[in-house]
Amino acid sequence: MCTKLFDPKLDYIFKKIFGSEKHPRILISFLNACIKPEHPITEVTIKNTEITKEYMEESFSRLDVLATTQDGEVINIEMQRADEKNMVKRSLYYWSKIFASEYKGKGRYSSLPRTICINVLDFKLLDEEKFHNVYILKNKENNNMLTDTL
């Protein structure tokens, strides 16, 4: 019997592992390990991964995995194998589109949920010793956090 393991860094395999509505426990475990939330994630709903184009000139974008937690937090997980030298801006673009899309239909800024982007990279992006890094918006003068919505 020949056992062949599939590379989980391949888009199709990654999406089958983490974006499956049939096996949410895998995604929940991954998110709890990455985010380390105060209250563990116990439930996720997989969402449509297509980013709606606002203008004709925009390119089509599809996220790898997009989910909502039981608390309404929206989480995007991207797997990137190749360094296309645009990951930071690409991640910010995806985050902004996801965040803005949550406003539509609700009409209240206060209803915007916490939105988290997790990038799983098969290359070194940052000059950091640790492979797991978390970034937030904060005041660069006094280090006070502006919000945990991002």
Each language-model region and where it sits:
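Elongated, amphipathic alpha-helical interaction scaffolds
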Residues: 1-150
